[in-house]
């Protein structure tokens, strides 16, 4: 999971407001003639060396993010497991076409070119110079040298004219600081003693489940996938699996994503493609969403493409950063909206919680907790299933002796992301939003094997032996693969995974409801029982919490047990 995560200093956390300035919408008018309204995209003050203003002629790709409609109805439909078609979701919940056209027209008047509206009308994307973007969004963009790289970021909150304040909630693309490139923990010498996909399936009660041939899974990746697909074919042969259909879906022109991309051939993509498809024995298809860079805007647009295409049932994202960054730049809001639509369509997204234990993943994680407390985005997304890490003590067949919380597994409570209502009986901290209007989302929701000392075997080439690798980058595709088996057994009608998991927990361990100053307050069962479909992990620590019976910030509800989970659902 981890890698070179970027860090910010002195984030501007002021809530959106209005600057009282008179004026109209004419692009010829000066910025001071508008009455500007702040969006959710706030100022970023980067910790690197500030180099001054970014070249005014530099070209940027910018997305204006529009709000969903009828948001108060979404969770009720999810809790009813009502699955809608993409057409129904767009008709009831997506922004109106007229709103998207209004935003598109504004950007065109401001000089934006190559404008497009996403299939769900959530994003209006176009190209502009820095000068045009600064004028259109009343902001300022500076350049920095950060960790040896030249990057840019907006140092002033992005705003829109008051007449567009109800159409634009955030702006993506005003910064390009990359999310950390995943760096899997591998053995210093070749190690073939790790778990095979068959052993992992056995460890998590999936061996006797039917192959997930009705379910399409997806992963997020970057670069030329030629070697990744070749390695998948080699792994299928060596591990004795049938070949699965693979589709590479580019979030933009292929040449711009593939050519000279330093992420081409990353071992992360081999892990994701091999374990998401082999743990469930087979899948209907594997979709690889290939994004140009690992910046927040690219990843957010990739998530939205997964939803707006509505081809895959499940998505795994082995990536992350300190969640306050995504909160500030608008990526958190964007993916929450996109994945809300996905949840209505019956799609689920899984994301690894990081390899820095209780700490914010600001630096290359080593599996040893260090730094200030914090959690990782996108694993803490409102509709995401965050997957933590375990140490899996089992024999080569996957017969389990014990499963412990892994010290590097990310976990904790977000001060930025709100907790979904179905999590509150398990996690009382989630109720803090009643007092602060934000925050309380805790991760992980579930967990799976991640410890590099109990690794899984991955083929990173088309010859030789597999490598033993670890990290929560393992846990996310493994868990998605397990849930793919369960979804196939239920004809893909289970709906949002995180709601399914917590509904079982809440049924087994109902909380006591008390009256609080702002409404009902849940008091969790002080002596929770194991939940059918999960292995309750009660030993181990991630440096900030200790695993215990029931829900905890190390391993969530526990690790999936596919056959039992399928029966319980």
Predicted regions located by residue number:
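An often Trp-containing, charged/polar helix-loop segment at the C-terminal end
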Residues: 487-553
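Walker A/P-loop NTP-binding active-site region of P-loop NTPases
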Residues: 482
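Short acidic, Gly/Pro-enriched loop/turn segments at secondary-structure junctions
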Residues: 393-400
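Intrinsically disordered, low-complexity acidic segments that are enriched in bulky aromatics
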Residues: 383, 392-393
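Secretory targeting and sorting signals
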Residues: 1-31
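Extended ligand-binding clefts on enzyme/binding-domain cores
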Residues: 401-405, 415
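Substrate-binding/charge-relay-adjacent region of secreted/lumenal peptidase catalytic domains
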Residues: 32-116, 125, 130-386, 414-471, ...
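Short glycine-enriched loop/turn motifs at secondary-structure junctions
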Residues: 118-120
């Amino acid at each position: 999971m981890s890698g070179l995560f970027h860090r910010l200093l002195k984030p501007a956390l002021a809530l959106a407001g209005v600057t009282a300035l008179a004026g109209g919408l004419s692009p010829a008018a000066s910025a001071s003639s508008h009455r500007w309204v702040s969006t959710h995209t706030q100022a970023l003050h980067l910790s690197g060396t500030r180099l001054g203003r970014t070249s005014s002629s530099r070209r940027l790709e910018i997305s204006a993010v529009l709000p969903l409609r009828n948001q108060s109805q979404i969770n009720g439909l999810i809790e009813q497991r009502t699955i809608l078609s993409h057409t129904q979701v767009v008709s009831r919940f997506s922004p109106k076409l007229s709103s998207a056209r209004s935003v598109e027209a504004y950007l065109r008047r401001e000089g934006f070119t190559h404008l497009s509206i996403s299939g769900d009308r959530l994003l209006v994307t176009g190209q502009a110079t820095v000068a045009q973007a600064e004028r259109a969004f009343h902001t300022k963009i500076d350049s920095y040298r950060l960790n040896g790289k030249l990057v840019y970021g907006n140092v002033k909150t992005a705003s829109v004219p008051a007449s567009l304040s109800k159409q634009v909630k955030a702006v993506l693309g005003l910064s390009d600081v990359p999310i950390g490139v995943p760096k899997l923990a591998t053995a210093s010498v070749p190690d073939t003693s790790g778990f095979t996909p068959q052993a992992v399936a056995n460890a998590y009660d999936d061996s006797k489940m039917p192959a997930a041939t009705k379910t399409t899974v997806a992963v997020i990746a970057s670069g030329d996938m030629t070697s990744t697909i070749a390695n998948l074919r080699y792994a299928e042969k060596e591990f004795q699996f049938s070949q699965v259909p693979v589709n590479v879906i580019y979030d933009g022109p292929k040449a711009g994503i593939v050519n000279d991309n330093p992420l081409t051939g990353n071992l992360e993509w081999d892990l994701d493609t091999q374990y998401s498809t082999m743990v469930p024995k087979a899948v209907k298809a594997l979709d690889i969403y290939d994004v140009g860079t690992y910046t927040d805007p690219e990843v957010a647009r990739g998530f939205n493409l997964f939803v707006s295409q509505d081809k895959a049932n499940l998505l795994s994202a082995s990536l992350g950063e300190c969640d306050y960054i995504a909160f500030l730049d608008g990526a958190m809001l964007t993916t929450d909206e996109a994945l809300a639509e996905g949840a209505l369509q019956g799609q689920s997204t899984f994301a690894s919680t990081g390899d820095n234990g209780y700490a914010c993943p600001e630096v290359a994680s080593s599996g040893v907790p260090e730094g200030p407390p914090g959690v990782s985005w996108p694993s803490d997304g409102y509709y995401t299933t965050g997957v933590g890490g375990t140490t899996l003590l089992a024999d080569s067949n996957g017969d389990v002796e014990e499963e412990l919380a892994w010290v590097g597994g990310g976990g904790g409570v977000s001060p930025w992301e709100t907790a979904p209502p179905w999590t509150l009986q398990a996690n009382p901290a989630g109720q803090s939003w009643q007092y602060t209007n934000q925050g309380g989302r805790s991760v992980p929701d579930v967990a799976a094997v991640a410890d590099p000392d109990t690794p899984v075997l991955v083929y990173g080439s088309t010859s030789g032996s597999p490598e033993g690798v670890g990290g929560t980058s393992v846990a996310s595709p493994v868990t998605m693969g397990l849930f793919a088996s369960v979804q196939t057994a239920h004809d893909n009608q289970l709906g949002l995974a995180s709601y399914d998991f917590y509904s079982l927990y809440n049924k087994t361990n109902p909380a006591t409801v008390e009256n609080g100053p702002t409404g009902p307050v849940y008091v969790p069962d002080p002596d929770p029982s194991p939940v059918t479909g999960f292995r309750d992990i009660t030993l181990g620590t991630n440096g900030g919490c200790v695993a215990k019976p029931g829900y905890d910030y190390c391993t969530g509800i526990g690790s999936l047990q596919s056959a039992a989970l399928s029966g319980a659902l």
